Amino acid sequence: MASGDFCSPGEGMEILQQVCSKQLPPCNLSKEDLLQNPYFSKLLLNLSQHVDESGLSLTLAKEQAQAWKEVRLHKTTWLRSEILHRVIQELLVDYYVKIQDTNVTSEDKKFHETLEQRLLVTELMRLLGPSQEREIPPLLGLEKADLLELMPLSEDFVWMRARLQQEVEEQLKKKCFTLLCYYDPNSDADSETVKAAKVWKLAEVLVGEQQQCQDAKSQQKEQMLLLEKKSAAYSQVLLRCLTLLQRLLQEHRLKTQSELDRINAQYLEVKCGAMILKLRMEELKILSDTYTVEKVEVHRLIRDRLEGAIHLQEQDMENSRQVLNSYEVLGEEFDRLVKEYTVLKQATENKRWALQEFSKVYR
C-alpha cells in the first residue's frame, strides 16, 4: 500500500475520538491500537452510522421496535382479560367462603350461581374451539349446541351482567387501594376520595420511578463501560510499571549482590562463633555440675602419678632398646646364643619343677 494511503497522527487521533464518542463496538481497544490501524477506526466510524448501540442495523431495530409495540399491545389486552377472569374467580371464591359462615340472600345466590354457570360454559366452549378447525373428535362427544343448552336464561344473564360490572369495579377498587397502601402506608388513614385521587396518579408515579430506574441502569451501564476502559488502560500502565520495576530490581540486585554476600558471610561467621561459644559454655556447665573441687584434686593426683609411671616406663623402654641395639651388633651368633640360653633356661625350669615335685613326695 502506498504511503499516501495512511492517515497522519492528527487525523488518526480525530478518528479515535469520534469512535470513542460513538462507543461502538463495545471492545477494549487502546489508543495505540486505533492509531496504528486508522482504516479500522474509519470502518468502525462508518459502521456506527448504520447500526445502533446494541449492534442491530437501523432497519432491523425499527422492525424490532414495531414488534415490541405489538407485543405490548397484545400483552395489555391479555392482561385485561386475565385480570377480569381472576377477579371473577375471586368473587366466586369469596362467595363460597362466605356461605360457610353466614346466610346469603336469594339475589346473591342467584347472581353467583348464574355467574359461575356462565363462566364454566364459556370456558368449556373455549376448550372445544371452532368446530370447523377440529380434525379429531370433540371431547366427550360434546358440541357447542350441547353447551348452549346449559347457558342461563337471557333475563338472568342480563341482570347478572349489570350487577357484575359493579362487583368488578368494587373489587378492583379494593385492590387499587391495597396497592396504594402497600406503596404508601400513610395513605391507609385517608378517605376514599383522597385514595381515589392518589390511585389515579399512582400509575404516573410508578412510570416515573420506572423511568428513573431505567435511567439509573443506563448510567450504570455507561459507568461500567467507562470502568472497563479505565481498567484496561490502568492494567496496561501497571504492566509497564511492573516491567520497569523488575528491570530496576535486577540492576540494583547485580550492584548490591556482592555486598549482600559479604554481609551474609560475616553474619554466618559470627553466628557460628556464637554457637561454638554456647556449646563450650554448656560443656563447662556440665563439667562443673559433674566434678567437685575434691574430685578434681584427686583426678589431678592420679594423672600426675600415671604420667610419672608412664615416664619411668618410657625410660626403661629406651634403656632396653639401647641394650637390644648393642646386642644386635653381634649378628647371628647372638641369635644362636639366645636360643641356646632359652633351651637351657627351659630345661633348668623343668628340672627345678621336677625336683620340687619329688621333694613334696618324700616329705
Curated annotation (Swiss-Prot):
Q: What do the Gene Ontology cellular component annotations say?
A: centrosome; cytosol; HAUS complex; mitotic spindle microtubule
Task: Tell whether Cell cycle is among the UniProt keywords.
Answer: yes
Keyword Cell cycle tagged = yes
Residue spans crossing the bilayer: none
- Entry keyword set: Cell cycle, Cell division, Cytoplasm, Cytoskeleton, Microtubule, Mitosis
Location comes to:
Cytoplasm, Cytoskeleton, Microtubule organizing center, Centrosome; Cytoplasm, Cytoskeleton, Spindle
| Record GO terms (molecular function) | microtubule minus-end binding
What the entry lists under InterPro entries is as follows: HAUS4, HAUS4_met
Single GO BP term: regulation of microtubule nucleation
Superkingdom assignment = Eukaryota
- Job of this protein: Contributes to mitotic spindle assembly, maintenance of centrosome integrity and completion of cytokinesis as part of the HAUS augmin-like complex.
Its subunit composition reads: Component of the HAUS augmin-like complex. The complex interacts with the gamma-tubulin ring complex and this interaction is required for spindle assembly. Interacts with EML3 (phosphorylated at 'Thr-881').
Q: Provide the family line.
A: Belongs to the HAUS4 family.
Under the heading PANTHER family, the entry gives: AUGMIN SUBUNIT 4 FAMILY MEMBER (PTHR16219), HAUS AUGMIN-LIKE COMPLEX SUBUNIT 4 (PTHR16219:SF1)
Q: What is this protein called?
A: HAUS augmin-like complex subunit 4
- Provide the species name: Homo sapiens
State the organism's lineage: Eukaryota, Metazoa, Chordata, Craniata, Vertebrata
Name of the gene: HAUS4
